């Protein structure tokens, strides 16, 4: 075997020892796996969360439009003679609960309550409404329900599932624990 090459001659004395060099290489490899892998996993977590909250095709955007339709429905129903203030207040409280909810799971639970409150208000108001009010109520309910269908068909939950599947495997599970990365919440 030939002698050491020029680069090896330039190494500090401790790194000329083969065992030290192997240990340093292992540390460098582990550092790159956990460092680069952690950064990639954190970016994946961020993009999964953004699928819920960012952009005009996100659940958050459709939920905002759904809340606007619910608020419009309360305005129209408030002009229908005989509709109880309690039923209107129920929808307004449910709107507030959706706005106050943190995270996909809490938003989904609050949205389910909003759905029930809106349908109760619509059922009460439509019986008492004149033709013009009926058309306005039906239009707002149709928009409200259309946004609900769009939310149900959104691909966020499948993206969250893919992320969670990735996070549950090795070494992602260990890297995620070191980086403080948690599973994505589902909108259910």
Each PLM stretch: what is its role?
Residues 1-188:
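A helix-centric hydrophobic-segment signal that preferentially recognizes long
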């Amino acid at each position: 075997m030939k002698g050491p090459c020029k680069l090896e001659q330039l190494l500090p004395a401790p790194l000329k020892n083969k065992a030290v060099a192997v240990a340093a290489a292992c540390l460098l490899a582990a550092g790159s796996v956990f460092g680069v892998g952690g950064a990639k996993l954190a970016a994946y977590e961020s993009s999964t969360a953004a699928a819920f909250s960012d952009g005009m095709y996100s659940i958050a955007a459709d939920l905002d439009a759904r809340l606007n339709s619910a608020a419009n429905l309360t305005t129209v129903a408030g002009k229908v003679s005989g509709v109880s203030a309690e039923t209107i207040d129920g929808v307004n409280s449910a709107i507030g609960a959706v706005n106050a909810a943190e995270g996909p799971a809490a938003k989904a639970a609050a949205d389910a309550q909003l759905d029930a409150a809106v349908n109760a208000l619509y059922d009460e108001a439509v019986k008492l409404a004149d033709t013009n009010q009926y058309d306005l109520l039906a239009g707002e309910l149709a928009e409200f329900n259309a946004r609900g269908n769009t939310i149900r068909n959104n691909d966020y939950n499948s993206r969250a599932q893919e992320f969670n599947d990735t996070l549950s495997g090795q070494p992602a599970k260990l890297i995620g624990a070191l980086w403080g990365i948690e599973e994505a919440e589902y909108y259910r």
